[in-house]
Amino acid sequence: MLEEINYDTKLFGLIGKNIKYTLSPYIHNFSFRTLGINAVYLVFDLDEMKFKRSISGILEIAEGLNVTIPYKDEVMKYLDNTDTHSTRIQAVNTIYKKSGYNTDYLAIKNLVRKKIKNVSGYECYIYGAGGAAKAAAFALSELGCSSISIVNRTKSRAYELAELLNKNGYNASIKENCNITNNILIVNSTPNSSVVPEDCVKKSDLVIEFVYRPVETELIKNAKKYGIQYINGLEILVNQAVEAEKIWFNKSVADEKIIEYLYARELVW
């Protein structure tokens, strides 16, 4: 955070509900200091009523925002425009001057490319059907996954996501759980990493975890146990934040430097 706030200080922040746990202020205020940017990043923890009453005002005064659960879908109707990716995904997690973007989508594409050069022919199982699941599903489909299988407790949400993907020309369906075959990618976008069976993990080629506290979730522990490649939630959180800063400032701090700072501050474990 800035030592001094003045007339020229720009306002950035995170909008969500029940987000006391978030690391976003630490990440972005560290980046602002490192980059020498006169800005401050705050948290707007809003219930549904407060969101409806305040969102228009926040959008007027903030230079840029991040959006998390449960408002990634709803915030779109308050924006002037959205980019191609967030329009197709129907979820926004980054805003710059009333324009919407999806950096979860960008982060998944960036990080998966580092692990597997070609995912063509892979079957992807996504646990969850919210905004993060949508971003992951579109990112993996565009990278070449042959099919997306949605596993979600609320079947209506799963059907909505599958229908959205199919309308965009991808191959999506609903499953009760994973079928153990070759060439599997697994994504957990739910708060509970134990939803993914261990048998599925040990047969997969890559595991993607959105939960970042603790960094080593049960899913990540199982991936390590069987020598499976993985992307942890902290990597996703930091990379999507870096992509947001590229949108806001056309520059950013390196992922590794941010992660090093978070561990040094003992904010992650």
Curated annotation (Swiss-Prot):
InterPro entries: Aminoacid_DH-like_N_sf, NAD(P)-bd_dom_sf, Shikimate_DH-bd_N, Shikimate_DH_fam, Shikm_DH/Glu-tRNA_Rdtase
Disulphides: none
Enzyme class: oxidoreductase
Annotated metabolic or biological route of this protein: Metabolic intermediate biosynthesis; chorismate biosynthesis; chorismate from D-erythrose 4-phosphate and phosphoenolpyruvate: step 4/7
Record-listed E.C. numbers: 1.1.1.25
GO BP term, example: aromatic amino acid family biosynthetic process
Residues bound to shikimate: 22-24, 68, 93, 104, 212
Keywords noted in UniProt: Amino-acid biosynthesis, Aromatic amino acid biosynthesis, NADP, Oxidoreductase
Residues involved in NADP(+) binding: 128-132, 152-157, 210, 233
Active-site residues from the entry: 72
Enzymatic reactions: shikimate + NADP(+) = 3-dehydroshikimate + NADPH + H(+)
Top-level taxon of origin: Archaea
GO MF term set: shikimate 3-dehydrogenase (NADP+) activity
Complex formation: Homodimer.
Functional description taken from the UniProt entry: Involved in the biosynthesis of the chorismate, which leads to the biosynthesis of aromatic amino acids. Catalyzes the reversible NADPH linked reduction of 3-dehydroshikimate (DHSA) to yield shikimate (SA).
PANTHER family: BIFUNCTIONAL 3-DEHYDROQUINATE DEHYDRATASE_SHIKIMATE DEHYDROGENASE, CHLOROPLASTIC, SHIKIMATE DEHYDROGENASE
HAMAP family: Shikimate_DH_AroE
Family (UniProt): Belongs to the shikimate dehydrogenase family.
Full protein name: Shikimate dehydrogenase (NADP(+))
Organism: Saccharolobus solfataricus (strain ATCC 35092 / DSM 1617 / JCM 11322 / P2) (Sulfolobus solfataricus)
Species classification: Archaea, Thermoproteota, Thermoprotei, Sulfolobales, Sulfolobaceae
